[in-house]
Amino acid sequence: MPGLRDAGPDAHRALGAAGPPGALGEALAALATLDALDAPVYIPGPDGPWDAVEERLDTTGQAVVCTRWGQWLTSALLDPELRPLLGQDWPRYRQTPVASGRLRFAVSRFVMKHTAALALGVNAGSLDLGYQLGGRPVLRGLGGELEVSLAHTDELILVGVSRTGPIGVDAEPADRDISFELLRDQVCTPREGEELAALPEDERRARLLRLWTLKEAYTKALGHGLRRRFCAFGFARDGEGRVVLADLPGGGDAGDEGWDFVTHPLGECYVVSVAHRTLPAPSPQPRSPEPGLPRSPRSPRSPRSPRRP
């Protein structure tokens, strides 16, 4: 198995990050001070602590985990079950030519499996991860009721899990140099383009980056990836200041309801966006009568309690 000796300088620098020093480390540590239940939770390794993730899952049905891939690297490489844990991703891991990219890939799946396992209360190795046509990760079999999403860039790994509906996550470096002139027609609706064009350059770049990550997160949640044109839908703020879908063809439909969109800066290092849709709870189904005991029309059995989200 490829290991530390072929990791390359980038991976060794990541491995050396036993703690969270530097600007990103400070930003991740600061997440613990946030009270917002929609904020990402920093998990420094497989041993957690996972309490905040469990709290968010119990309270909202979804949670977002973030970490530095170097902090999970040793645990991933020394795990004797890494190959079965990666499953169908093992060939891609082995065939990725650049060592740092190969290890980052393995760690990202390692983090996603451990986060999903925590949400489901199972062992990470028991989960079977597959991919839809657009690249969206899906858990099959045992974890089929849990939605998952993954993003990684530079040092950062971001994983979203949801028991209550689709979820998508995206992250970009906060200092990413993006050209409004080149991307306007590809990313923005006409209204969004006009609003951004009226802003000072620095504010416009920051707003465009935030918009980009929101649209990435939304299309990931839908499972469309880059197949859906970003300029075909937009975002705006409603009367309460919440981010909502806008500029939809034909005014939208019922499938556009129930979405929540949030963006969080990780200090001055990254911009993180999350799209999550809470689906209606399934209607309770009545129990079938026991064999040989016809149900009394005057004494119907209690309906089956809906599954806890």
Question: Whereabouts are the PLM-identified features?
Answer:
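Core catalytic alpha/beta fold that binds nucleotide/phospho-ligands
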Residues: 2-309
